[in-house]
């Protein structure tokens, strides 16, 4: 029995990055030998065991053979005669097909170290084409390592295009698509994930609402980048700089979906695109089974982001109605989230990346003023039932009006 550290732990150690999870491969052992050594079996489809002390995963070396469609249609063979090289060959990328033995020696049969140095994401073998999930995984790796200047090898991107054109991605379940997308959205450069999917044709298959934005123009005065798809990815990039929150990033991605519905004869203007985009957000989230809290914020951002941009001319009554609409009294975090997504929208434009966004500050300040109005005083004044809400709203509007006159006067007044 020989044990090797494999995959991501070896890759990240060679890149000088923190190693989070360790996976191990065991060569020359049987399931019974693992059980006798105190390991606990957890793998259903193939033999995977948990170490009795560390609880890290130890898998018996195995090979895989395509036996059906999609990413689940594989037959696994795990036995003592499966070599380390054979196990590594079934992996997706050369940089993930690395192993390290007890002595610290790197085993690299598929030139993963060379590709690490060249900053290349390259598939190990043609078997890559048998698993459509790998298209999303490569896009996610491209996003994860974009800050290190990694790029996808030409032949790998070509294979990803072939897989997409062959309809392989249609076998992916919504849950798997969302899981990869969720992981990609938490990387330093989530926009790269969606750009790679577009480059290989997968964006049109998996995210048609986003793909439809490419080629849709916006007024050059407001959007020097002109293309709405390009703006969407620039905005997502900016959101990633402003916030690590998944919900902020996802909402930013969806903020302009309504522009894909504008008839061509009305281009480049997109009047009413915010409310129009809400249905598309709902559609995308339902299809991919996106969690409800992410969906709800994305719908609100789609509907109200343009309103935030016009904050100086908003009436105090409109500002308080906005807080009602986003349910800020029960979910105060939404004020900050919407301020961030609106800022990302403005700064996610060519030449505006370093712009100040005072509207975000004003929104936060107005919220502090509105929520500081004490409910207790309204109740003590004798108001009852629905009158409490009505009086509270009046007092909030008055407080915001007083604040706005001093801090953010209407430029037209």
From Swiss-Prot:
Lineage top rank: taxon: Bacteria
Binding site for ATP: 8, 11, 91, 137, 140
Residue intervals of the HD domain: 228-329
Cofactor binding, note field: Magnesium is required for nucleotidyltransferase activity.
UniProt entry tagged with the keyword Chaperone: no
GO MF assignments: ATP binding; CCA tRNA nucleotidyltransferase activity; cyclic-nucleotide phosphodiesterase activity; magnesium ion binding; phosphatase activity; tRNA binding
PROSITE patterns listed in its UniProt record: HD
Gene3D superfamilies registered for this protein in UniProt: Beta Polymerase, domain 2 (3.30.460.10), cca-adding enzyme, domain 2 (1.10.3090.10)
Keyword Hydrolase: yes
Catalytic activity: a tRNA precursor + 2 CTP + ATP = a tRNA with a 3' CCA end + 3 diphosphate; a tRNA with a 3' CCA end + 2 CTP + ATP = a tRNA with a 3' CCACCA end + 3 diphosphate
Keywords: ATP-binding, Hydrolase, Magnesium, Metal-binding, Multifunctional enzyme, Nickel, Nucleotide-binding, Nucleotidyltransferase, RNA repair, RNA-binding, Transferase, tRNA processing
InterPro entries: CCA_bact, HD/PDEase_dom, HD_domain, NT_sf, PolA_pol_head_dom, PolyA_RNA-bd, tRNA_CCA-adding_enzyme
Cofactor(s) this protein requires: Mg(2+); Ni(2+)
Annotated CTP binding sites: 8, 11, 91, 137, 140
Binding site for Mg(2+): 21, 23
PANTHER family hit by this protein: MULTIFUNCTIONAL CCA PROTEIN (PTHR47545:SF1)
Function: Catalyzes the addition and repair of the essential 3'-terminal CCA sequence in tRNAs without using a nucleic acid template. Adds these three nucleotides in the order of C, C, and A to the tRNA nucleotide-73, using CTP and ATP as substrates and producing inorganic pyrophosphate. tRNA 3'-terminal CCA addition is required both for tRNA processing and repair. Also involved in tRNA surveillance by mediating tandem CCA addition to generate a CCACCA at the 3' terminus of unstable tRNAs. While stable tRNAs receive only 3'-terminal CCA, unstable tRNAs are marked with CCACCA and rapidly degraded.
Family: Belongs to the tRNA nucleotidyltransferase/poly(A) polymerase family. Bacterial CCA-adding enzyme type 1 subfamily.
Assembly information from the UniProt record: Monomer. Can also form homodimers and oligomers.
Note: A single active site specifically recognizes both ATP and CTP and is responsible for their addition.
Annotated domain remarks: Comprises two domains: an N-terminal domain containing the nucleotidyltransferase activity and a C-terminal HD domain associated with both phosphodiesterase and phosphatase activities.
Protein name (record): Multifunctional CCA protein
